Amino acid sequence: MAKLISYAKGGFLRNTRLTSRAVPQVYQHATSSRGFVHLTSSVAQSSAIHVSTPSTPSLMLIMGKRTMFIQTQDTPNPESLKFLPGVEVLGKGNTYDFPSVAAAHCSPLAKLLFRVEGVRSVFFGSDFITISKEEAAEWGLIKPEVFAVIMDFFASGLPILHEARNNADTEILEDDDETVMMIKELLDTRIRPTVQEDGGDIVFMSYDNGVVKLKMQGSCSSCPSSIVTLKNGVQNMLQFYIPEVESVEQVFDEADKMADKEFERFERNLKQKDTSSTAPVGIGGGPAN
């Protein structure tokens, strides 16, 4: 997401209007720290974990045992982490968001990942899996379990999704006017790939009276900088090429709203506990008068 902001501020926008496929080139640079973990599947009766290097093949067969090199990559959201298994997950350009365990009914892999304690949400990309954790959870405890789940699942040969599904939000429809078509084109060809590099996705919801409504997914859904990304990155880019766009707004679905309510309730309970623990205690253990 930081790439979109720096791109909009860095003067990389060409002084041309967006037509058909005339879209801006995104300035890309490596900003994320990466880790490599070599796992030997427990299906192959081994649980060895070794440090690997970027040049090591992602998937190989050694002495009849299936091994996988899983790469981890930080995201702008400290509560989200990308896992790159070195093999295709959903295929180029495809994503699937699982904001809660209830949404994982169509994916055996997502169900298994939600069983890992501390996992809050799961997101599948073309060749990566983004895990978002609870704030109190620690990556040091979550990562080994996620590694094991991914390794065992890919060794099993089970389908990742019960039903194949392509992203349809940017598909050009018969009733789309020129403005909507240009918005979808720019989102699909330049903005979405950049956001997916950060372990998330951006979904077109609607356009009406100059307002573009978008939904953030994956690491971007709860990222502290998501609003800044929308305003300083996505909105500026859309407005430059499509003057009809007046503003960009983020929308939330029911799962997002429920998660926010649960978090607010959790915070209130913590504050109440803190207040009761610091209150003066009288004789007999009751509050002092």
Swiss-Prot record:
Which region ranges are annotated with the description Disordered? 267-289
User: Residue ranges of region NifU?
Assistant: 183-251
Tell me the InterPro entries matching this sequence: FSCA_dom_sf (IPR034904), Nfu/NifU_N (IPR014824), Nfu/NifU_N_sf (IPR036498), NFU1-like (IPR035433), NIF_FeS_clus_asmbl_NifU_C (IPR001075)
Q: What is its main location?
A: mitochondrion
Q: Which UniProt keywords apply?
A: Iron, Iron-sulfur, Metal-binding, Mitochondrion, Transit peptide
- Identify the residues that bind [4Fe-4S] cluster: C220, C223
- What Gene3D superfamilies does the database record attribute to this sequence? Fe-S cluster assembly (FSCA), Scaffold protein Nfu/NifU, N-terminal domain
Keyword Iron carried by entry:
yes
Task: Explain the purpose of this protein.
Answer: Molecular scaffold for [Fe-S] cluster assembly of mitochondrial iron-sulfur proteins.
The family annotation for this protein states: Belongs to the NifU family.
Name of the protein this chain belongs to: NFU1 iron-sulfur cluster scaffold homolog, mitochondrial
Can you name the source organism?
Drosophila willistoni
